[in-house]
Regions:
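N-acyltransferase acceptor-side catalytic subdomain
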Residues: 1-141
């Protein structure tokens, strides 16, 4: 669990589907259901980060570590896939700042297990650019 010093924000990381409470939202790519599917699939390790403020869910993001099972030498690199930039459940919050907090949190969390973190299907390629750069991400076409 991480508590952001800038606001009364609490980031909770879930590693087991049985620990995840029922959460609001309708984005399948950041849902408990997809977490459970990945959890039941060999070679995949899902991690779910939920941002709350005073018991209210503000945002959630599902990241998935994919273990490389290839027998080719030097292909033992694990990679992390993230689809989009998460789901935001409160329109009054600064989504980009909240994304920056979640990005910093899970980058530290995941970098121990995955050598590559890739964001896919970004709706707006400039969303969170400042936070990507401050966490040492770089764009690739």
């Amino acid at each position: 669990m991480y508590i952001c010093p800038h606001m009364a924000l609490k980031l909770t990381t879930y590693y087991k589907g049985s620990d995840i409470p029922d959460l609001p939202g309708n984005n399948f790519f950041h849902s408990k259901e997809l977490f459970l599917l990945y959890e039941a699939t060999p070679s995949y390790t899902p991690i779910y980060i939920v941002a709350t403020e005073e018991q209210k869910t503000l945002a959630k993001i599902l990241v998935v570590i994919r273990k490389n099972t290839s027998l080719i030498p030097f292909s033992i690199l694990n990679r992390c896939d993230v689809y989009g930039t998460g789901e935001y459940l409160d329109d009054t919050i600064d989504k980009e700042t909240l994304f920056g907090e979640m990005l910093s949190h899970f980058t530290k969390e995941i970098f121990r297990e995955a050598s590559i973190i890739e964001f896919r299907n970004l709706n707006n390629s400039l969303f969170g650019y400042k936070h990507f750069r401050s966490n040492h991400y770089f764009p690739v076409n």
